[in-house]
């Protein structure tokens, strides 16, 4: 069944300003859109029909969060588990999956897809919108670096800047390799735009890039919040143990060091204030898995560097205060646990995450 059917009219244009993923998938016949629909439809077809239909509707309402649920469910299946979606718990809550593995061991898994560094993400999305609009204006033989972009939040607000950029692009001479880069700046109602044209004589299409977005990373804070979430804890308490929290970690989200710090604690390198030489390294065990013995999760399954085109193999972080027999398919992942420090055990299996056959397109 095609839960995301092919559009009836051809439209290979890219996504437009503030268009949602679902809106784009509904109208676009671009090869990438076709590939995304194929991945989703194929993945949904692996689930029981009732659950697949329900998850499809959820994807239309909140694509990113429920895409992660789809990926986790499929990954459990790839690991050899038979899954029961949304089983009723002893306290009338429902966990995302109860998984029975090939060795007979049962585990429950709850998924969480947090939005990390949201303000920075909004800024980068706005920059991407402006870059797409300016790509339509050219030029082809110059690479345009955004040194500064305005605070435009709609196509109408950005249109005066586009008009000025077109005039600037039209004034550019034939590029000379290693020639001086022309610079353009214009102040409008939504702030200043600064562009630098870098000679690129062999270019065949418009190329815009930058600016760098700086921000204070809140990944550790958001990871801790996921473990403190009252509803998630309630779901875990009502589920068949051991219960694992699967966390979505996109490229712009937390890495393994963020998880180490959030769950176990922080390694501190003490240095002499004058010479800068190290005086010794200590470990501050202030992570939630160490300080909060009431956490009902047996561990966290971190899906690192996850996107629709691939991912790193998940890493299993174990709660040091819970001792359960683990399914062999989970225990064979790279695991980390706190003893007197962070103990890491390498994976004993080949990576399997890409057996999901993520989105592929030319």
Regions found by a protein language model. Give the residues of each.
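An acidic, charge-biased composition feature
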Residues: 1-11, 29, 120, 253, ...
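Interdomain/boundary linker segments immediately adjacent to catalytic/signaling cores
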Residues: 1-66, 119-161
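Metal-dependent nuclease catalytic core centered on acidic motifs
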Residues: 28, 114-297
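Histidine/cysteine-enriched polar flanking segments
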Residues: 42-48, 102, 107, 340-347, ...
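Nucleic acid-processing catalytic cores of prokaryotic defense/repair systems
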Residues: 56-57, 73-80, 240
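Elongated alpha-helical scaffolds
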Residues: 64-73, 78, 107
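Short acidic loop-to-beta-strand element that houses the catalytic metal-binding Asp/Glu
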Residues: 76, 86, 91-111
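Charge-dense, extended regions
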Residues: 287-362
């Amino acid at each position: 069944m095609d839960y995301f059917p092919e559009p009836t009219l051809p439209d290979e244009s890219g996504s437009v300003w503030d268009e949602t993923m679902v809106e784009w998938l509904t109208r676009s016949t671009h090869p990438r859109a076709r590939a995304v629909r194929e991945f989703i439809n194929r993945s949904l077809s692996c689930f029981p029909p009732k659950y697949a239909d329900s998850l499809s509707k959820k994807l239309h309402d909140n694509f990113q969060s429920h895409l992660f649920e789809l990926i986790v469910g499929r990954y459990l299946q790839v690991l050899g588990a038979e899954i029961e979606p949304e089983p009723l718990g002893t306290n009338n809550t429902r966990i995302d999956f109860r998984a029975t593995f090939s060795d007979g061991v049962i585990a429950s898994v709850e998924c969480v897809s947090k939005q990390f560094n949201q303000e920075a993400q909004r800024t980068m999305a706005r920059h991407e919108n402006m870059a797409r609009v300016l790509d339509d204006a050219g030029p082809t033989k110059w690479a345009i670096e955004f040194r500064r972009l305005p605070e435009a939040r709609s196509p109408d607000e950005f249109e005066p800047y586009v008009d000025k950029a077109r005039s600037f692009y039209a004034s550019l001479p034939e590029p000379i390799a290693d020639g001086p880069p022309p610079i353009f700046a214009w102040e409008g109602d939504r702030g200043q735009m600064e562009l630098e044209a870098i000679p690129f004589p062999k270019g065949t299409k418009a190329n815009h890039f930058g600016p760098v977005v700086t921000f204070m990373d809140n990944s550790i804070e958001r990871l801790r919040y996921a473990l403190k979430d009252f509803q998630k804890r309630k779901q875990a308490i009502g589920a068949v143990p051991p219960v694992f929290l699967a966390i979505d970690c996109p490229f712009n989200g937390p890495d393994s060091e963020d998880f180490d710090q959030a769950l176990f604690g922080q390694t501190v390198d003490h240095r002499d204030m004058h010479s800068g030489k190290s005086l010794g390294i200590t470990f501050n065990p202030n992570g939630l898995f160490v300080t909060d013995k009431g956490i009902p999760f047996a561990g966290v399954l971190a899906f690192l560097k996850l996107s629709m085109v691939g991912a790193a193999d998940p890493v299993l972080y174990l709660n040091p205060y819970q001792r359960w027999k683990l399914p062999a398919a989970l225990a064979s992942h790279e695991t980390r646990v706190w003893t007197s420090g962070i103990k890491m055990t390498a994976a004993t299996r080949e990576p399997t995450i890409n057996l999901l056959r993520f989105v592929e397109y030319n």
